[in-house]
């Protein structure tokens, strides 16, 4: 490994914190994850372009996520494009939306397609990514029992409990 944190010439640098999105890709396909995150091989497709377009609104930072100790039970939270990290967990994630009220918060992750007709209404990689977002919120002191996957094409919100 080189002194600048890279594996070798032509490879992507090793991140200090593991992005939740990288874990999503690994759960979906370990080989594809390696090609994308280690080899740096990635090409846009019509699906990824659609996904980028679907995220335009949520990628615009709006609203503020108050520190957990300042989030009062009667305060409504609606904050977009929030980045959270934890050295203890070794994770970093960009949360599309964090909603909250009555002292609890809930991450909402946007997906471009329609809700899949699978048990639980969500694919496993998305479930894992959302669980990591919940863990990060808890690590920052928030009360969080799960999240929501919002499917843009079908305009459906699917709750995902996290123990």
Predicted features and spans:
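Metal-dependent nuclease catalytic regions and adjoining charged, substrate-binding loops involved
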Residues: 2-8, 88, 120-121, 136-163
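Short amphipathic alpha-helical face segments that pack within enzyme cores
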Residues: 128-135
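Short, conserved loop/turn and helix-capping segments at secondary-structure boundaries
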Residues: 123-127
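Metal-dependent nuclease catalytic cores that hydrolyze phosphodiester bonds in DNA/RNA
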Residues: 1-107, 114-118, 128
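A short beta-strand motif that forms part of the nucleic acid-binding face
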Residues: 110-114, 151-153
